[in-house]
């Protein structure tokens, strides 16, 4: 799920950037340090939308660096258990499917793939397919899955998915 939330970040700035473009430098550094990162609490920061406040800088004693507190709003992606999402298959093997849901990795065990779909190691590329070959899931295909669990680390989120519900599977 995508959310638009308020966040805070501290920017450490080297003295060589002090000058007429100081605030623009702080903004650019915020974009490069924050966008594309993941915090376990809020999820993946997709994009900074607005910068609400750049606080007064605090000089670091003995270093000359300045620490600027910045308050901003961003769009974040935070998946939850039970959510149905579209994903791209990145790897197919006998234990299951590995997929990517935007910046997040997701694994679908062969036990969470419908029983009428069998792994075919002899096809090129390897795939899961039905007996009548009506449905074939292989690398780079787009599938719809249900998230059945997530593991949140400090800088990453990993999900476990399933194709065992109605309307899940290959997106045509």
UniProtKB/Swiss-Prot annotation:
It holds the Pfam family S1. One of its GO terms (molecular function) is single-stranded RNA binding. GO terms for cellular component: nucleus; P-body; RNA polymerase II, core complex. SUPFAM superfamilies: N-terminal, heterodimerisation domain of RBP7 (RpoE), Nucleic acid-binding proteins. Gene3D superfamilies: Nucleic acid-binding proteins, RNA polymerase Rpb7-like, N-terminal domain. InterPro entries: NA-bd_OB-fold (IPR012340), RNA_pol_Rpb7-like_N_sf (IPR036898), Rpb7-like (IPR045113), Rpb7-like_N (IPR005576), S1_domain (IPR003029). It is found in: Nucleus. DNA-dependent RNA polymerase catalyzes the transcription of DNA into RNA using the four ribonucleoside triphosphates as substrates. Component of RNA polymerase II which synthesizes mRNA precursors and many functional non-coding RNAs. Pol II is the central component of the basal RNA polymerase II transcription machinery. It is composed of mobile elements that move relative to each other. RPB7 is part of a subcomplex with RPB4 that binds to a pocket formed by RPB1, RPB2 and RPB6 at the base of the clamp element. This is DNA-directed RNA polymerase II subunit RPB7. The lineage of its organism: Eukaryota, Metazoa, Chordata, Craniata, Vertebrata.
